Amino acid sequence: MKRSDVFLRPEYAPHRALWRASGLIDEELRRPLIGVANSWNEIVPGHVHLDKVAEAVKAGIRMAGGTPLEFGTIAVCDGIAMGHEGMRYSLPSREVIADTVEIMVEAHRLDAVVMVTNCDKITPGFLLAAARLEVPVILINGGPMMPGVYGKERIDFKDLMERMNVLIKEGRTEELRKLEESALPGPGSCAGLFTANTMNMLSEAMGLMLPGASTVPAVEARRLWYAKLTGMRIVKMVEEGLTPDKILTRKALENAIAVDMALGGSTNSVLHLEALAYELGIDLPLEVFDEISRKVPHIASISPSGRHFVVDLDRAGGIPAVLKELGEAGLIHKDALTVTGKTVWENVKDAAVLDREVIRPLDNPYSPFGGLAILKGSLAPNGAVVKASAVKRELWKFKGVARVFDREEDAVKAIRGGEIEPGTVIVIRYEGPRGGPGMREMLTATAAVMALGLGDKVALVTDGRFSGATRGPAIGHVSPEAAAGGPIALVQDGDEIVIDIEKRRLDLLVDEKELEERRARWKPKVKPLRRGILRRYAKMALSADKGGALEY
């Protein structure tokens, strides 16, 4: 018995009348009622085409004998929200998305749901919703954008962000306009391995997306093929009773981390996987990420770490090929269940790597270590995260003098104004989950650093986040955050800070007695917040090492 059968009982005549008022007939009510949670809107370039993806999903549901019922949820474009107050709303939107899907599915007793996703916080929000639901769930993404072409060069959002600063400074407005018109050629999630594509790939690695689906470009017909197959598969999952609790296990999370390390994904993936683990009630300390990072080599160098794009990874075999490589070396849990009803290994055992320059063999990796590293030390007792694959090896150890800012805007002004000297560690604090609130991304700051030729001369440390497009020695998610009284709140201009990625250390070279005196004088900065979601998030958000999730 499916749970929507409740509407077929005689005493549910008023409910059936309401369904009929929406246009449904008896035959449709007798079939599985399948929700299609669509994050389409006309704002986000990664989502403008999701209406077509959702239509293909619904076609697949009908072909398999189900009744599709589409509803919407919100989606924020992190790129459009970047570099201003709007970025405070991005991370809190993750929980709102999870809430909206949970409410719609549970309130209307739907039998299953397909989640149509693509960009940064939408996929993590859907994953949190899946963790809460007791009905079958599949995700289908809208696919990556193709890289832009500027002259003979392939480019992406990162290139525009970094080059913009120099072009503006030199007054080359026409060249900036041409670059702006070339960087993002059409629909899809930004072409590099930024947060959106990272989280879609990890959803596939965890088994919540059909094998091969996550990397198919937005503009290809295969995107609609996968959408139809997803719609067909969800109906079968209702018959099988295949629910997320059977798929979203510790093994699935560890498989996702292994793929993340092999690819060198966005540092935001750590935040979102920690939030998912919290939602699932699974203890996932940051040390697990570090343990896996030390075992899994970095075998795919995709922008911003390298010159390849997600479309190249797709052509090389996609996530099935990556999982096959890791599986043959015993670096994933082969027996983890997936939405196909089969194990990960059953899905990928026949996959092949089609381009060894894009996906290297494990014995010839880009780096013997995973793409992300967890740092701890006197400046980050509970941890911090760096995209090690995007840091030149000669910068893995960096000792510098602190220049402290209490908001991103002040740091950006100083960088663009030529106030930052080589050997500086730029510290941006009070940008954490509660202190921000909202834990903004610092891409504007890091892009300015790279553009002005400081990328190998300075480092940046923050209790905020970084965009997946960030490269260079940028250390984020410093925990505890400044607003919670973490050591980062006590840093002063002129203090020495040591970053050692190989030893996984982040240390403030100030003696304990001096820190105690500073702590005695420290007072938390309280930002006035009007009523609304930021005020609520500031009160309820956990620290970055817990994913910035809302505390239950």
From Swiss-Prot:
Which GO terms of the cellular component aspect does the record hold?
Answer: cytosol
Q: Which cysteines are joined by disulfide bonds?
A: none
The active-site annotation reads: S467
Might you name a Gene Ontology BP term for this protein? Answer: isoleucine biosynthetic process
Cofactor annotation: [2Fe-2S] cluster; Mg(2+)
Which PROSITE patterns does the record match to this protein? ILVD_EDD_1, ILVD_EDD_2
What does the cofactor section's free text say about binding?
A: Binds 1 [2Fe-2S] cluster per subunit. This cluster acts as a Lewis acid cofactor.
N6-carboxylysine found at: K121
Task: Please state what class of enzyme this protein is.
Answer: lyase
Q: Per its UniProt record, what Pfam families does this chain match?
A: ILV_EDD_C, ILVD_EDD_N
Q: Which residues are recorded as binding Mg(2+)?
A: D78, D120, K121, E441
What EC number(s) does its UniProt record assign?
A: 4.2.1.9
The protein's annotated catalytic reaction(s) are: (2R)-2,3-dihydroxy-3-methylbutanoate = 3-methyl-2-oxobutanoate + H2O; (2R,3R)-2,3-dihydroxy-3-methylpentanoate = (S)-3-methyl-2-oxopentanoate + H2O
| Annotated positions binding [2Fe-2S] cluster | C119, C190
A single Gene Ontology MF term assigned here is: dihydroxy-acid dehydratase activity
Write out the entry's keywords from A to Z: 2Fe-2S, Amino-acid biosynthesis, Branched-chain amino acid biosynthesis, Iron, Iron-sulfur, Lyase, Magnesium, Metal-binding
Q: In which pathway does it act?
A: Amino-acid biosynthesis; L-isoleucine biosynthesis; L-isoleucine from 2-oxobutanoate: step 3/4; Amino-acid biosynthesis; L-valine biosynthesis; L-valine from pyruvate: step 3/4
What does this protein do, in the record's words?
Answer: Functions in the biosynthesis of branched-chain amino acids. Catalyzes the dehydration of (2R,3R)-2,3-dihydroxy-3-methylpentanoate (2,3-dihydroxy-3-methylvalerate) into 2-oxo-3-methylpentanoate (2-oxo-3-methylvalerate) and of (2R)-2,3-dihydroxy-3-methylbutanoate (2,3-dihydroxyisovalerate) into 2-oxo-3-methylbutanoate (2-oxoisovalerate), the penultimate precursor to L-isoleucine and L-valine, respectively.
Q: Assembly state and interactors?
A: Homodimer.
Q: Report the sequence similarity comment from the record.
A: Belongs to the IlvD/Edd family.
What name has this protein been given in UniProt?
Dihydroxy-acid dehydratase
Species name: Ignicoccus hospitalis (strain KIN4/I / DSM 18386 / JCM 14125)
- Supply the gene name: ilvD
